[in-house]
């Protein structure tokens, strides 16, 4: 939350009001300097000096991106400046005919208008009509553009992860798909199913049935030995292009698989996985994109009735110790670390037209990061990740 001009230039309201204030102040100080000091109200010098201090304070607060923390203080300070400028205007107009005094009065009128705008904005509730109108230009218009350096970059990184790993986890005869329902809440941009294994055809019900009993020659659970009691493990990779050598495979065709009570059920080892499956086992690498899977600790065997080719979900009914949670970023390997905690000052309902926004309630504690703009990347306690408006939350000391 350090000083950065990007925080100031990224807010059109800040640029317009501070720039207008500086120009108005220059007009006022020029008129005061050119006036005859015998007829110029001496107290107006203090009002003009006080005004430039207020303008500089507001600029610094915007540049440090903590303007929301001092809004109530600014209302009091700007109200004092409003009294000074309006009083100076009255004295300069009616008590003197000096051109310099009239020029200073014009500058004070402009400063009075600016101070009134600041009082209405800083003193108004974020959901008030005036604030909503002003924020429609700054927060909605400019704030979402900052996602290019924050949340949208995160989406782009996830897209790259999808491309590099091919995001495939075939469940049947080599062609599997993963639908929108299998993605984390932050990845709703995928509106249509994605062909995972690179094929062009979706698996048929017959291929899924054959795959579940390991009778497809090119499927991941194919039985190439002719022994119905032995299911060959996968020889390809789920997410990458490198094949893995099975470590728990029994190549003796006279032996049977002992990892499952069902002899017709294939098995796979952790060496065949790339992290997209999010097993709870610590031996499985977590370099995927954080897909939520219904998997168990003891996942060496798969139930032959639990293959769902439409969604890519895997169930294991032999073990009830399941993990059905949205994984943290440290587990998914996305590289995102939420370094700060923030408390919601108000309740917020996400815009239904923006899939990146998240809703939250007043006093809710959020984990936030990328706090350099009007919109911060945030994660709720339930694991939902998205963006939230910075003026609705307050950073907490940790």
UniProtKB/Swiss-Prot annotation:
Region feature Disordered, mapped onto this chain? 145-167, 213-327
Q: Write down the PROSITE patterns for this protein, in alphabetical order.
A: SH3
One Pfam family cited in the UniProt record for this chain:
SH3_9
Instruction: Name the source's superkingdom.
Output: Eukaryota
The residues covered by the SH3 domain are: 337-398
Q: Where, by residue number, does the polypeptide cross the bilayer?
A: 13-33, 43-63, 66-86, 102-122
Q: What is its main location?
A: membrane
Query: What this chain does, per the record?
Result: Plasma membrane osmosensor that activates the high osmolarity glycerol (HOG) MAPK signaling pathway in response to high osmolarity.
| Protein family per UniProt | Belongs to the SHO1 family.
Please describe the quaternary structure of this protein: Forms homooligomers.
State what protein this is by name.
Answer: High osmolarity signaling protein SHO1
Q: Which organism is it from?
A: Candida dubliniensis (strain CD36 / ATCC MYA-646 / CBS 7987 / NCPF 3949 / NRRL Y-17841)
Please name the gene that encodes this protein: SHO1
């Amino acid at each position: 939350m350090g000083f950065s001009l990007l925080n100031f230039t990224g807010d059109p309201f800040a640029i317009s009001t501070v720039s207008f204030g500086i120009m108005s102040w220059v007009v006022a100080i020029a008129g005061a300097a050119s006036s005859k000091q015998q007829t110029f109200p001496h107290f107006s010098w203090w009002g003009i000096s006080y005004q430039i201090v207020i303008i500089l304070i507001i600029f610094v607060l915007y540049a440090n991106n903590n303007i929301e923390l001092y809004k109530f203080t600014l209302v009091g300070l700007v109200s004092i400046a409003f009294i000074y400028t309006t009083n100076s205007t009255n004295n300069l107009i009616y008590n003197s005919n000096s051109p310099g005094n009239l020029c200073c009065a014009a500058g004070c009128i402009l400063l009075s208008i600016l101070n009134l705008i600041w009082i209405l904005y800083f003193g108004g509730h974020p959901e008030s009509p005036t604030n909503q109108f002003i924020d429609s230009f700054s927060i909605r218009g400019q704030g979402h553009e900052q996602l290019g350096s924050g949340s949208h970059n995160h989406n782009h990184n996830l897209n790259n992860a999808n491309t590099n790993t091919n995001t495939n986890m075939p469940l049947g005869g080599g062609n599997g798909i993963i639908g929108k329902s299998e993605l984390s809440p932050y990845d709703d941009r995928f509106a249509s199913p994605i062909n995972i294994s690179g094929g062009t055809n979706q698996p048929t019900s017959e291929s899924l049935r054959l795959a579940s009993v390991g009778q497809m020659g090119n499927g991941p659970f194919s039985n190439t030995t002719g022994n119905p009691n032995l299911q060959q493990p996968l020889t390809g990779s789920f997410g990458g292009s490198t094949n893995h050598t099975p470590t728990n495979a029994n190549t003796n065709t006279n032996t049977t698989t002992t990892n499952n009570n069902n002899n017709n059920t294939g098995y796979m080892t952790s060496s065949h996985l790339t992290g997209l499956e999010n097993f709870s086992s610590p031996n499985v690498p977590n370099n995927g994109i954080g897909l939520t899977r219904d998997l168990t600790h003891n996942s060496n065997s798969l139930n032959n009735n639990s293959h769902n080719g439409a969604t890519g979900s895997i169930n294991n009914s032999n073990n009830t110790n399941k993990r059905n949670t949205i994984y943290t970023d440290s587990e998914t390997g996305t590289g995102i670390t939420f370094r700060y905690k923030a408390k919601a000052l108000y309740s917020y309902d996400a815009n239904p037209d923006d899939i990146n926004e998240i809703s939250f309630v007043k006093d809710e504690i959020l984990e936030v990061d990328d706090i350099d703009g009007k919109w911060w990347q945030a994660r709720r306690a339930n694991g939902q990740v998205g963006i939230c408006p910075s003026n609705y939350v307050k950073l907490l000391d940790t």
